[in-house]
Amino acid sequence: MHLLIPAAGSGKRMGSGHNKLLLNVLGQPLLSWTVQAALASQSIEWIGIMGQPYDFPAFEALLTPLHSPKPVQLIVGGDTRQQSVFNGIQALPPGAKFVLIHDGARCLATPDLFDRCTEALQHCQGLIAAMPVKDTIKIVNADGWITDTPDRQGLWGAQTPQGFDVALLKACHDKGKQEGWEVTDDAALLEKCGQPVKIVPGEDTNLKITTPVDLAIAEFILGQRSAKSA
């Protein structure tokens, strides 16, 4: 399985002023934890990391001590996640049939989640890891008034990895560029193209590290895991 990791974010909501994936988490850059989980996966054979060239020296520095037995390629990302993934697709090795896409900021994903998504992708053309929402969701208008309360039973919170047939994903990205679609994940492109996307149960701990509170939670969970494996 081939894996693409968008890692070109600026970390504005983290208040760091630079790429949040380079923030220190228990002595290692956040991105390092994400890559280590992918390397520990039995199914991942190749990894592409999309980022900005000025971050490449830092990426190379965090990759060196990992001594990856699998190829890891740095790919120039775009101004948006959608553009970065498009660039990553173009850089896939010839013959790549399927691809997983995983947010660099989801450093708590386990190797098992990558492997379960890989297995599920053998039986569909598109999937996402997701979890049923636990909170009641309110739809609110621009003035702050609740307009609806959707049935929670049918609501799932999207995570990554998301997995796709490469040829289909390329076609949907091309269609998106032609139509000017702007989406926040690749599953939405398939949806707009009328293609079905399957849900694979994600993980409660698979948080996207976006705020300082998220970072503190990640440090706690990774610390607990490290203690158990010691």
From Swiss-Prot:
Pfam families the record matches: IspD
PROSITE patterns for the chain: ISPD
SUPFAM superfamilies per record: Nucleotide-diphospho-sugar transferases
One GO location term (cellular component): cytosol
UniProt site (Positions MEP for the nucleophilic attack): R152, K208
Recorded catalytic activity of this chain's protein: 2-C-methyl-D-erythritol 4-phosphate + CTP + H(+) = 4-CDP-2-C-methyl-D-erythritol + diphosphate
Cysteine pairs bridged by disulfides in the record: none
Molecular function (Gene Ontology), one example: cytidylyltransferase activity
One GO process term, biological-process aspect: isopentenyl diphosphate biosynthetic process, methylerythritol 4-phosphate pathway
Pathway it works in: Isoprenoid biosynthesis; isopentenyl diphosphate biosynthesis via DXP pathway; isopentenyl diphosphate from 1-deoxy-D-xylulose 5-phosphate: step 2/6
Residues the record marks as site: Transition state stabilizer: R13, K20
Enzyme Commission number: 2.7.7.60
Keyword Transferase assigned: yes
Keyword list, A-Z: Isoprene biosynthesis, Nucleotidyltransferase, Transferase
Function of the molecule: Catalyzes the formation of 4-diphosphocytidyl-2-C-methyl-D-erythritol from CTP and 2-C-methyl-D-erythritol 4-phosphate (MEP).
Entry's family note: Belongs to the IspD/TarI cytidylyltransferase family. IspD subfamily.
Protein name, entry field: 2-C-methyl-D-erythritol 4-phosphate cytidylyltransferase
Recorded name of the encoding gene: ispD
